[in-house]
Amino acid sequence: MTDDTKKPGPDADVAEEFVDPAQAGEEQAETAEPDPVELLKAENADLRDKFLRLAAEMDNLRRRTERDVKDAKAYSLAGFARDMLAVSDNLRRALEAIPDELKTNGEAGLNGLIEGVEMTERSMLSTLERHGVKKIDAEGQKFDPNFHQAMFEVPNTAVPNNTVLQVIQAGFTIGDRVLRPAMVGVAKGGPKAEPSASAEPGTSSLNEKDA
């Protein structure tokens, strides 16, 4: 090989100085700083997502707080209401202990006393009802262990089996909870009861007397 072949020609310098424009653009793109507008957009999207999450959490907290306050208000009276129902039961027992003859032919003083006791009972139950305590309408309903407590069974083929025939002590609810179940006697031996349309028995006015 001669010395001429070893020496780089003029074209070699040009080749070394030549840079591919596409490659140069890629290198510039890699080294270029991020677009501030895109950074702001990404930051704004992140802040918006955090705000929406925080707003949802605050709304859930507000709903829970309102529900807790409502429940506390409704059920804080449960113990007091239960005690008042015991007083009402005693008034009812006192009235039922009076013979019918005395009620019919009793003296004016006795009749006035009976009317006073009945008025006191109605007033007490009416006051409890205004505070959310409602009487369970049990008689004639299908027995429901969630609302009724069976005390005895009565053979009766004229009504569907497990129908409440008699209420020994009225039951009550407060809000959506059972304050005390109704003590009842249920039918036995009749046809099978049809499924009830509603799982929850109705309620009636507290001013109605126990069956």
Swiss-Prot record:
InterPro entries: GrpE, GrpE_coiled_coil, GrpE_head. Residues 201-211 have a biased composition (Polar residues). Residues 1-37, 187-211 are annotated as: Disordered. CDD domains: GrpE (cd00446). Residues 1-10 have a biased composition (Basic and acidic residues). Residues 27-36 have a biased composition (Acidic residues). Transmembrane segments: none annotated. Participates actively in the response to hyperosmotic and heat shock by preventing the aggregation of stress-denatured proteins, in association with DnaK and GrpE. It is the nucleotide exchange factor for DnaK and may function as a thermosensor. Unfolded proteins bind initially to DnaJ; upon interaction with the DnaJ-bound protein, DnaK hydrolyzes its bound ATP, resulting in the formation of a stable complex. GrpE releases ADP from DnaK; ATP binding to DnaK triggers the release of the substrate protein, thus completing the reaction cycle. This is Protein GrpE. It comes from Agrobacterium fabrum (strain C58 / ATCC 33970) (Agrobacterium tumefaciens (strain C58)). The lineage of its organism: Bacteria, Pseudomonadati, Pseudomonadota, Alphaproteobacteria, Hyphomicrobiales. The gene is grpE.
